[in-house]
Amino acid sequence: EALALNHLETDRFLHSAYASGLACLTAEERDLGSVIVDMGGGTTSIAIFMEGKLVYVDTIKIGGHRVTTDIARVLSTPIADAERLKAIDGSVMPAEITGIAPDPLREVVRLGRSDNITIPTLGSATEVIGQTIERNLLSAIIRPRIEEILELLQGRMKQAQMEHTAGSRYVLTGGA
C-alpha cells in the first residue's frame, strides 16, 4: 500500500538474507557454497548458497535486540547505553582482545581479567551513576545469546537437512 501511495511498483520481493547474500558474497563464494547469517534487531535470517544459487532460507525471531537487553539487565544500564556498549565495545571473542581464552560469566566476575569499560547505570533521574566493568564481562554477557542464536539456526538447518550443504563458509552481516 505504501508503495502504491508513492507511485512505486515492485517487480518482486526478496528475502533479506538472500539480498544480503547477493550484496556480501562474491560470485565465487556463492558458487562454492556459503551460509550468510543476517542478524537484525528482532530477527536473524540465514541463506545458503550453493553452485551460485539460493538453496535454503530461514528466519528466527531472535536478533540483536535480545543481546542489548541482556546487557541492560545484567549491568543495570539504560537500553541506549547497552546498545552503544554492544556496538562499540562488544565482542564474543575476548581472547582476540586480551589473549585470554573466553571464560563463563561467573569465572570472569571471579577472576577479573581484561581491560576496563566505564558504563552509566540506572539511577535517579537527576544523577548519572557510572560503574567500571571488565571487557571480558561484557563478552561473557554477549556470547551465550549469540551462541543460542547460532545453535537455533544450526538446528533449523539440520531439520531441513541442509547443515552440510554449504561447507564451512559462514558470513555474518546485519545491523544488530
Model-derived features with residue positions:
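Residue-level signature of catalytic and energy-coupling elements of molecular machines
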Residues: 3, 38, 71, 153, ...
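Active-site proximal loops enriched in glycine and acidic residues that flank catalytic Cys/His/Asp
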Residues: 39, 48-50, 58-59, 121, ...
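A conserved active-site cap/scaffold subdomain adjacent to cofactor or substrate pockets
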Residues: 61-85
